[in-house]
Amino acid sequence: MTQLADLRRTYVLGALSESDVAPDPMSQFKRWFDEAVTAKLPEPNAMSLATVDADGQPSARIVLLKGIDDRGFTFFTNYESRKGLDLAANPRAALLFHWVQLERQVRVEGRVEKVSDDESDAYFATRPLGSRVGAWASAQSREVPGRDVLEQREQEYRSKFGENPPRPPYWGGYRLVPTALEFWQGRPSRLHDRIAYRLQPGTGWQIVRLSP
């Protein structure tokens, strides 16, 4: 087996200072995200979403960012999935973007709210037909006897709805409204740059440097 202690790399691609970053974190995120897209990274909108249930049990999974604006970060899912039930019990969550090739991470924390039905309908209509049918066929996060059951359900809903399946009432979007963000740039000797934004009531965003 590979010796895990030997798996390491030196980070040399960039630096980040307080004078480099935008005054608000959403502008800074868009800047870094655009650079990740320009670098042709695979799925730059992939992010880890961490939630906590009513008993304090955490869980995490990779989801795709589908919207970003001054209000926050938008993603879509089944409201009855594990993450949906977690968010119903505890509407706070964390996101993590890891752009390995750029030696960068972005951490986001905040409260989560459902987007409007109109927003969910508009996004659902852009999804491929198979994904729209799949939203009906899959009771996400629940046990299923076998893949054949999923495929049978898919065929049933494809026959039922044809080319225009509507959005299921249990499926839609969430928006994470950030209260804290951290931008991490790898540096040599593990002295990484960590610039954090913290939302201060009544005064806006505070920018601070954190020790690596």
UniProtKB/Swiss-Prot annotation:
Q: Which residues bind substrate?
A: R8, R9, T10, Y11, K66, Y123, R127, S131, R190, L191, H192
Going by the entry's taxonomy, the superkingdom of the source organism is recorded as Bacteria
Q: Which cofactor does it need?
A: FMN
Q: Which residues of this UniProt protein bind FMN? A: 61-66, 76-77, 82-83, 105, 140-141, 184, 194
Which EC class is this protein assigned?
oxidoreductase
**UniProt cross-references to PROSITE patterns, sorted A to Z:** PYRIDOX_OXIDASE
MF terms (GO), sorted A to Z = FMN binding; pyridoxamine phosphate oxidase activity
Q: In which pathway does it act?
A: Cofactor metabolism; pyridoxal 5'-phosphate salvage; pyridoxal 5'-phosphate from pyridoxamine 5'-phosphate: step 1/1; Cofactor metabolism; pyridoxal 5'-phosphate salvage; pyridoxal 5'-phosphate from pyridoxine 5'-phosphate: step 1/1
Show the stretches that span the lipid bilayer. none
Q: Which reaction does it catalyse?
A: pyridoxamine 5'-phosphate + O2 + H2O = pyridoxal 5'-phosphate + H2O2 + NH4(+); pyridoxine 5'-phosphate + O2 = pyridoxal 5'-phosphate + H2O2
> What Enzyme Commission number(s) does the record list for this chain?
1.4.3.5
Q: What is this protein called?
A: Pyridoxine/pyridoxamine 5'-phosphate oxidase
Instruction: Give the species.
Output: Cupriavidus taiwanensis (strain DSM 17343 / BCRC 17206 / CCUG 44338 / CIP 107171 / LMG 19424 / R1)
